[in-house]
Design a protein with these regions (language model features):
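Glycoside hydrolase catalytic-domain context in secreted enzymes
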Residues: 1-430, 451-809
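Short beta-strand elements
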Residues: 430-449
Length: 809
């Protein structure tokens, strides 16, 4: 097939063997199930309650047994052939003789949940029904083992336990309905059990000896109700496991899969124990990142008194077997910290272990977290008694801190003098300190930059000793002279304009392309891209800077679309948990586990495999750009979109995202890494200002993007909706040109998120190449004519868009 012909051809050409489609194929669904099992985390297993012995009789409690949540809402939703809930998964195990089920209970829940669905409820947003006492009595007579399933749903555009306090802020009608519905179901917010769930749990505990809990959730939830509860000896964090998540959970509880997932977030005793909770809902117009770099375990392992608030530490996860990790050696070699270790399976079952290497930098003048993850490695499946040697390494410069106030060297990464210590283990809390240290006699500047994207309204930030330091404030950046700002209502939800230029037919346009400048000449080496762009009229270049109409099964619009110049219309598609195609198209794709679960595998190779499989589905359906991965940090459990993001730790997020991008782009379709950056709150996300220090910005919130840019070369980056220190992210030249391109040498294209509140020509000037889902050509043209933007600035963005298109096959 010739260059770009796939983008013109409908229906699709199958990419599978023997003319079969790969989209939603049995092979991809099996991979989804495998990944789900790999990422589930066993957080409690007293008395070896799990796995269930063969033939165990089981009673299934909780509407979550039926009301399974495969993933979050919004861009993360996926149209699939089927969704396997936990009851269906356990029935498959029963058919194989592994367990025996008391069916009347799930049948009761099935009837109730169907009634709630019929009344308009969606998975995860249903009410826990009261179980009839006679059913409990019959179940108790049948068995002493019960499994409770708790489920949660969240989605794009709204946060958990959302509170709107600011006068003058008006909710959209769908936002209002979602918030009201959530409040009516989750009396204390969905971080905690509902009253109905709590009553059900108490009833089960009172009647059954062995109580197991399966948590079908997308992010952090309350764990205090089961952590020290003797009546609940086993708990599996099953997350949102995609279309086969219910069967994958059954695989784990029956022992067909030995859990090897590890937590990628810290689970504190209460929601109030997270430093971000205090001001998360303080205002809809801004969020102060006062905790600074002390996010997640960096806070709980460092700040005095915080460690005791942790129920389950970052990196924690149990197995049905046991492992012994021995450090064989540690050294600094060629600018890298290198640690060699051996892992031996000392138990009776085959299993996998994750070796985690942390470092602790000297406090110095800047202050540092007590521990920071430097590297990690997951073993292969080790048989009983088998040993594997692993090597973990990272550069010495990775331990540098950014000095944003000039305490050591202004706007520089510095390694402060002193001893750097190291820890190896299978979670941050239990990692053992090594005898080896890296000693630095003098402070060293590893990279010198300039101040970019600095805060103006952030008044204070947390220090390592638990106190706060005051930060300089001012009135904020002064906006350059330009056109009067558009009314925000004109920036909401408009479709790309379809212009019938002199009513020319497509054939006429193709004929024109034979004599016009043609992008195919660049493909064939007849002219350079610069030469091609120089020949295009300014109006054509401006046209390229906005989204284009959908073709085929696409519903998130295209890029390019100048056939008279040989430029194809490259389609985009959501989303993070699988290729998202509207149900009316009749195309079922594969729903992968949510990003948090994938991160919990601690297995970049597996994530890359999923990226490749997902990329095949995207390509087969004539889509060019897949709007994933999303790598924002789990700053707070309250963010409604955490299921779509990987972790509280930027290294895990970056390594996971880079693996996904490599897999996707091996199929020559483009990744769009999002949301750049600090999109850690959904409420008023288009106008909320994230106030964050330069240090926290670089060390925490930009770091995952930096890793992906340097390790995976993504075709595109998606700028976020929010403001960052008073400047719209899509108009933020400091970020898009200064850091992304100037410091990291990013060569790809930047797109806005869909229907941002940024002014199109200002976004272009900042280095945001294309405005999605539609551009405002007349505004850019007016700004050009009035001298507020130059042809060179327009052409630079157009060239980056065309470079991206040239990378497609």
């Amino acid at each position: 097939m010739g260059k770009w012909q796939r983008s013109l051809y409908q229906p699709v050409l199958p990419l599978g063997k023997d003319g079969k489609r790969v989209t939603g194929s049995a092979e991809h669904i099996a991979l989804s199930r495998k990944a789900a099992g790999e990422g589930m985390v066993l957080v409690k297993n007293e008395n070896d309650t799990l796995p269930l012995a063969k033939g165990t009789k089981v009673a299934l409690f909780g509407k979550g047994t039926i009301d399974y949540v495969k993933g979050g809402g919004g861009s993360g939703d996926v149209t699939v052939e089927y969704i396997r809930n936990f009851y269906e998964g356990m029935k498959i195990k029963e058919a194989k003789g592994e367990v025996s089920l008391f069916h009347e209970l799930p049948e009761f829940y099935e009837k109730n949940v169907k009634e709630q669905y019929a009344a308009g409820a969606v998975p995860g947003m249903t009410r826990e029904p009261e179980v009839p006492d006679e059913l409990v009595t019959k179940a108790k007579a049948y068995t002493d083992t019960a499994i409770i399933t708790i489920c949660r749903f969240s989605g794009e555009g709204w946060d958990r336990k959302c509170q709107i306090n600011d006068e003058g802020y008006e909710l959209f009608e769908d936002e209002k309905k979602q918030i009201e519905l959530s409040a009516s179901i989750f009396e204390n917010g969905d971080f905690y059990l509902t009253n109905g769930e709590a009553a059900m749990v108490e009833k089960v505990k009172a009647n059954f000896k062995n109580v197991i809990v399966v948590m079908n959730v997308g992010g952090m939830v309350d764990t205090s109700w089961f952590k020290d509860c003797k009546e609940v000896p086993a708990v599996l964090m099953a997350w949102q496991g995609g279309m086969e998540g219910g069967l994958a959970a059954a695989d784990v509880v029956t022992g067909d899969v030995n859990p090897s997932g590890k937590l990628v977030d810290t689970y504190a005793a209460t929601l109030e124990d997270y430093p971000s909770t205090e001001n998360f809902h303080k205002s809809v117009y801004y969020v102060d990142y006062n905790e600074d770099i002390y996010v997640g375990y960096r806070y709980f392992e460092t700040i005095p008194g915080a460690a005791e608030k942790v129920n389950y530490p970052f990196g924690f996860g149990l197995s049905y077997t046991s492992f012994e990790t021995e450090v064989l050696g540690a050294e600094e070699k060629d600018g890298k910290i290198v640690v060699k270790a051996s892992v031996t399976n000392t138990g009776k079952r085959a299993g996998k272990e994750v070796v985690q290497l942390y470092y602790g930098a000297p406090q110095g003048k800047l202050g540092k977290p007590a521990k920071e993850l430097g590297a990690y490695r997951k073993t292969r499946l080790l048989q009983s008694g088998e040993t594997q040697r692993v090597v973990l390494s990272f550069t010495v410069e990775d331990m540098a801190s950014f000095d944003d106030l000039g305490k050591v060297a202004k706007s520089a990464y510095v390694l402060e003098a002193g001893s750097y210590v190291f820890y190896v283990g299978n979670n941050v809390r239990d990692a053992k300190k090594l005898d080896f240290t890296y000693d630095l006699a003098e402070t060293k500047v590893t990279a010198q930059y300039t101040s970019l994207a600095a805060p103006h309204k952030l008044e204070k930030r947390l220090l390592a000793d638990g106190t706060y330091e005051a930060l300089p404030t001012d009135n904020g950046p002064v906006e350059e002279e330009g056109l009067e700002r558009q009314d925000k209502l004109t920036l909401e939800g408009f479709l790309p304009a379809v212009k019938a230029q002199e009513r020319k037919s497509f054939g006429e346009l193709m004929e024109a392309a034979k004599t016009n400048p043609n992008l195919m000449n660049v493909v064939e080496g007849k002219e350079t891209l610069d030469e091609f762009v120089d020949k295009l009229p300014t109006e054509a270049l401006i046209h390229l800077l906005g989204g284009q109409p959908n073709t085929g099964v696409a519903n998130t619009f295209g890029m390019g679309n100048l056939p008279e110049y040989g430029i194809p219309n490259i389609m985009t598609a959501d989303g993070p948990a699988g290729l998202r195609i509207q149900p009316q198209c009749g195309v079922n794709t594969t729903a992968w586990p949510c990003a948090t679960l994938l991160a919990c595998t601690w297995d970049p190779e597996l994530i890359e495999e999923i990226g490749k499989a997902g990329g095949e589905e995207v390509k087969e359906n004539n889509i060019g750009i897949w709007l994933t991965p999303a790598v924002n940090i789990h700053r707070s459990p309250l963010c409604g979109r955490n299921f779509e993001y990987y972790s509280e730790d930027p290294l895990v997020a970056g390594k996971s995202g880079a693996a996904m991008v490599r897999g996707m782009q091996s199929e020559h379709i483009g990744a769009s890494v999002k949301h750049f950056c600090c999109n850690n709150k959904e409420t008023n996300r288009k106008d909320s200002d994230s106030r964050v220090s330069e240090r926290a910005l670089r060390e925490i919130y930009l770091k995952a993007f930096e890793i992906i840019v340097k390790e995976a070369d993504p075709y595109t980056i998606m700028s976020s909706y929010n403001l960052i220190n008073g400047v719209q992210a899509s108009e933020n030249k400091d970020l898009l040109t200064g850091i992304l391109r100037g410091e990291w040498d990013f060569k790809g294209m930047v797109t806005t998120d869909w229907w941002t509140h940024g002014e199109h020509y200002r976004e272009t000037k900042a280095g945001n190449d294309i405005k999605m889902a539609n551009g405002y050509e007349e505004r850019v043209q007016e700004a050009f004519e009035k001298g507020y933007i130059t042809r060179d600035e327009i052409a630079l963005c157009a060239k980056r868009i065309l470079t991206m298109i040239l990378r497609m096959d």
